[in-house]
Amino acid sequence: MDKERILTPAVVFSVALLHLAIVALLWQAHKLPVIESGNVIEFVDLGDFGGGGGAPEGAGAPAAPEPQPAPDPPKPVEPPKPVLKPAVTKKADADIQQPKEKPKPEEKPKPEPEPEAKPAPKPAEKPAEKPSEKPAEHSGNASAKAGSEQGNGEGKGTGTKGDGTGRGEGSGKGSGGAKGEHGEGAGGSGGGTGVGSSKGNPLRANGSIPRPAYPALSMENDEQGMVVLSVLVSPGGHVESVKVVKSSGFSRLDNAARKAAQNGHFQANAWTEFKVPVKFELN
């Protein structure tokens, strides 16, 4: 195909040159000679135009012939123009392959998150049972039938109350003689009962504080709302920490409520977490 494309213009150009050469030869063969025209000078004798002999003027010499106009040169024959035929070239079909779409990988379904196991609620601590006073067993001497009195022995256990949980039991034994002697008893001691608390596991209670001062900018901007605080109090009433459980939507009101709770005083004999609502309202 490339060789045919190169030879076709060369052949057309060669044929055109041959036609031009033939036309030039024909033109030279039929070319007519050009007649050169010029000025003709004639000498005329003035005596011939009349004079002393009485002859009329102009009778002595014949009139000069009028010059004939030169014939028009023949028009040159225009050679036929060579007709150039457009070279037809065949275009090879481009071997273009459209890229095939790759199949999209199927999305695997995401595994649903397993629900977190909630810790089982702690059972409420039951107050320890108070130590029951058990009457001491009494025994008499079966062989002493003559004694009218029997001896009884008793024992009691005592304990003091304190923080924490515990159980204490007291027991006593007594023996009686035939003569009605008093028995001897011994009492046991044990811990008291009570509900314990710590900083990590404080008691829960509701509390309140006096209404704090309304921030000036909040009053100008007409800010209102309720703040719920979580106040951790140590034994003795000292405030350990203050957290905002529910915000009012305005930071100035939240900070005012937190500051008032931090400077407040609560009554607590154990670690206690108070839930304190503070309401800001413009009258």
UniProtKB/Swiss-Prot annotation:
Basic and acidic residues bias locations: 90-137
Protein name (Swiss-Prot/TrEMBL): Protein TonB
TonB C-terminal domain: residues covered: 199-283
Gene, per the UniProt record: tonB
Listed PANTHER family: PROTEIN TONB, PROTEIN TONB-RELATED
UniProt membrane topology term: Single-pass membrane protein
Cytoplasmic side: 1-5
Membrane-spanning parts: 6-27
Lineage per the UniProt record: Bacteria, Pseudomonadati, Pseudomonadota, Betaproteobacteria, Neisseriales
Family assignment from sequence similarity: Belongs to the TonB family.
Organism this protein belongs to: Neisseria gonorrhoeae
Subcellular location: Cell inner membrane
